[in-house]
A protein has these predicted regions:
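A surface/extracellular/periplasmic glyco- and lipid-processing/surface-interacting theme
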Residues: 1-218
């Protein structure tokens, strides 16, 4: 749902029954590993099922073969951010589904970015080191049980609106997230309804359900 407005290709290896039915309904650019095995591989130095890899080159070739060459979308407003003199949010904690997935961010003024940790340890990319987004967004979202909840899954409510917290430049701002329907872009607006400009570079977004998860900072 969040990827739909970007006309993005969805690269995945299987998924929940509901997610698969949505991705395969013809409204998405589905590049499932199950049907495009030559564009993915399994590494022997990691445990299955978390050992499937691909590459930008292979996905570019696959997209080109399928005619997925261009996308039209409305992006977030962007700005050239710089650290504030008196930061008020240099440590951010986002509690999600449990201790193995809870994340924290430590603000680094020198790079004006946030050093990400997960499960109490630095969250690293094997190639590039610790993940350091320029902006972190935490959104309050609801969940709902399936009408036919035979598989035990719940759906995150990706449309509608709710509260959001935007961390950048060492500060936090309260905003409203909104998404009118599945094909509409996700919007982040301030109390006057104006789009909030996000720093250029990486933005990491976390969605949590109040009562089950939380966000805090200091």
């Amino acid at each position: 749902s969040w990827a739909a407005p970007y006309q993005a290709s969805i690269a995945h290896v299987g998924g929940s029954p509901n997610a698969l039915s949505q991705v395969r309904n013809g409204n998405y650019r589905d590049i499932d590993q199950f049907f495009n095995d030559g564009s993915y591989w399994r590494s022997r130095d990691r445990y299955a099922p978390h050992n499937v890899y691909t590459s930008g080159e292979k996905l570019d070739q696959l997209n080109s073969a399928k005619g997925y060459n261009n996308s039209e979308f409305t992006s977030f407003a962007r700005a050239d951010g710089k650290p504030v003199e008196s930061p008020n949010a240099t440590s951010v904690n986002i509690n999600l589904s449990g201790s193995l997935y809870n994340t924290s961010y430590a603000y680094d003024k020198a790079s004006n970015s946030y050093l990400r940790s997960m499960a109490g340890a630095p969250h690293t990319d094997r190639e590039d080191g610790q993940i350091t987004p320029n902006t972190v967004v935490a959104m309050e979202v609801g969940v709902e049980a399936r009408a036919q909840n035979y598989d035990g899954y719940e759906d995150v409510k990706t449309t509608g609106s709710g509260k959001a917290y935007i961390f950048q430049n060492g500060t936090v701002a309260t905003a409203t997230w909104s998404k009118a329907d599945i094909n509409s872009p996700l919007k982040l607006t301030d109390e006057s309804g104006k789009d909030v400009a996000l720093n250029r570079g990486q933005t990491w977004i976390a969605a949590f359900t109040p009562g089950r998860g939380s966000v805090s900072w200091q």
